[in-house]
Amino acid sequence: MTEYYDLNLLEKETSEENNFHTKNQQVREDLSILYSILVALEQLEKAFTKDAVSTSDFNSTCELLIQQWESCFSDERVTQAFGSFEDFCSKYRLQCPRAIKRIQEGISDERSQSNSTFSNAISTTAEPSIAMNDTTPQTVNPTKAPSNPSASIAKSIAGLVQNFITTLDAIRLNFIAKDQLHPLLSELIVSMDDLTESLKIQVSCRNKLVQWLIKINNMNITDQLNDVEKRELLYDLEQAYAECYSLL
């Protein structure tokens, strides 16, 4: 695949508005999660069309991702910041037509099912015990999804994308000191290793990121990357992301 998603997830604002310790950080994190879900779901849809994922795994993973999607929108601030699908995808240069359609259909189906269940409950009020027994199998088991290999891979993809976004965003905001960069880059490499191990693939750009991690680890606690190093690290991270995406 030649195209890949633009990682400039969040437009540059003032340093005060983008401070990781402000109240808006949770909104930024939720937007990153939404971005990750769209990317993961788009890849899942493509894998399903190639018979790389079974129907049962596909359905359960879609259900999990849609539940996570709706959970993010429980915060009204996230809803306002997200806007519409068109606004969000245009702003962050996303091309996820399959994912958008699946989410829209999934939410619509859930609402229809909820209304149907409610109507059935009313019609069987004369036999409440039967109604309760009928609805019991519809309860979602929260421990079921993690045991699903496809769900685990989708979660790993979403986590890797989010780590790329967080690391790149931090560097662009000049979080370039050792104590700021080291944990971000470490977590990114770990999440990359988890995914590549699951998919049995190798990422050549990983070596460059490891070299950066070693270099940052050898810095003094007060040291920061200079402008040239900052640009080089950003470039290597973007190259690594592009390679990861092309392998999915």
Curated annotation (Swiss-Prot):
Native source organism of the sequence: Schizosaccharomyces pombe (strain 972 / ATCC 24843) (Fission yeast)
Principal localisation: other
Name this protein carries in UniProt: Vacuolar protein sorting-associated protein 28 homolog
Domain VPS28 C-terminal, chain residue ranges per copy: 152-248
Subcellular location: Endosome; Late endosome membrane
SS bonds (residue pairs): none
One annotated GO molecular function: protein-containing complex binding
Membrane topology category: Peripheral membrane protein
Subunit structure: Component of the ESCRT-I complex (endosomal sorting complex required for transport I).
Coiled coil: none
Annotated Gene Ontology cellular component terms: ESCRT I complex; late endosome membrane
One protein family per Pfam: VPS28
